[in-house]
Amino acid sequence: MKTQQVRNGRPRLSVAIIVRNEQEVIAETLESIRAIADEIIVWDSGSEDETMSLARKNGAKVFQGFWKNDFSAARNDCLSKISGDWVLWLDAGEKLADLSAKKIRDFIDSAADPQKTYLIMVEIPPADNRTAGEQIAQPRLLPAKAGLKFEGRLRETLYPSIQAAGLKVETAPGLISRHPRQHSQARKTRLANRDLGLVELELIDGNGSDPRLFLAQGEAYINLGSFDRAREAFIKAIELSEPGSSEMLEGYYGLLTGYNYDPDLRDAQMRVCLNALEVFPLDVQLLLAVGSYFQIHNRLDLATRAFETAVKFGQTNSSIWHLCELPELAASCLSIALQLQGKEDEACRVLEEALDRHPQSARLLRLAIDSYIKTGNAEQCIKVAQRGGMLSSREDPLVLAIRGACKAAKQEWTPALTDLQSAYLMGCRSKLCLRWLAVALLSNGQAEAAKPVLDQWQKLEPANPELLAYIAAVRETQNAFVIKAEQEAEEEVGKVKTAVRQYRIDPGSAISEIHPIRIPFVQHVTSSDMSITEET
């Protein structure tokens, strides 16, 4: 890698990618950066598929290297092929999201300082539409300076050489989005087995005092389902970490994750969480976790205090994997805790203030609409829908659906059905309309009429637990009519109404998204400081 040199007044950008057997995703990655890259370097460690051919077809210079069971060796060899002034690191399967390519190119051309390295946010999409994604800020944009190099067989890092070179670290614009395959269990298993082997090699080399090795080991055991071993590894990582360091916080996240899979260990999990809060008292994720624990145990006063602290003073360590939308999630948790205490007005005020800060948050918009429906406040609900761009005009059929939903929440079934069915006939197929129309029909004992509505709702949210409860209740009712007398079947109809009442307590089942709080961060902690690749 050469020293910084700008040609023709415009810095040259080299994009560097390490690959092995990535034919399914390499083209998409290269397509996302082709317009801004002056050079694309693909370093291949032994692909047996069409990866190299596809890379060349998409404009990359391809170099074949020998995999030495060492990520740093691979990355440093790749760096030696670079001829640009700046290096942007990507992995196969990653791409620059939305307008990020232009933002990064403009930043390099006008604002990037060769005496600095830059963090770029990397995001993993959510596994489904009911969970949050995860993100981390990683050093992905580097000046092409001699002396910058990676260290570590796995979880390789640039930070020692960045510090030695006297470079500052700041944040650049843009977002790198990872492929949904991050959620593939088969892939997690393959990478976990690889990483355990690399950890063992590092330990043989005498590097057993590095907490990052045990963080990687713990992550691997989590993905293999060996939770006892995972907890042991994370405890070791915590013991080896500097107090208050990112490694220690990540160790606590991992240890808490290791308790997620056994409900009998919930109390032990919370003891760990409280210990972690003594070191990291304002960490948002820890506050949400302990607040959820108190909420489960009906200590709503303590839950509210934890959530309120997260909203007002919460901090996020962006250098380790954390949930996306943490401020929005904290406000949602606080609002729900207040609702459970009957403090509806205060809960709505929390959501309104959060929407002022995050006006495009789908989570907050959904919860605010659910909250106003629950209180029967149709006009305020319509205002929130307008604010979120959900309504084309006041004549939008969704307005009728909202009015019907508010009436249904107050158990005014006949006028509710009139509005909801009118909205449906006018073509409204929003989840709000389908959900509340199904609720109204089921509450009136019209299970057969509710079936097509439930089917359409299921196409939008196939895993929604409220929906699945309704479908199961309808199916049970239909079976009852076949095998029982009419009088007995009436009792089964009551089960449908019971299911409706159960979910009507909390419209939208909003609590299910955060109650109990899961801490899945280590499931996506990478095999390296930079990325996951397919080296074996």
Where do the protein language model's features map onto the residues?
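Short, well-formed alpha-helical segments that are part of the catalytic scaffolds
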Residues: 17-36
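Cell-envelope/extracellular polymer assembly enzymes that use nucleotide-activated donors
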Residues: 12-14
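Conserved donor nucleotide-binding strand/loop of the catalytic core
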Residues: 52-77, 81
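Short aromatic/hydrophobic "clamp" motif used to bind/position activated sugar donors
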Residues: 87
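A conserved acidic beta->alpha catalytic loop
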Residues: 32, 44-56, 67, 91
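Catalytic-site signature of metal-activated, phosphate-bearing donor transferases
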Residues: 72-79, 90, 96-232
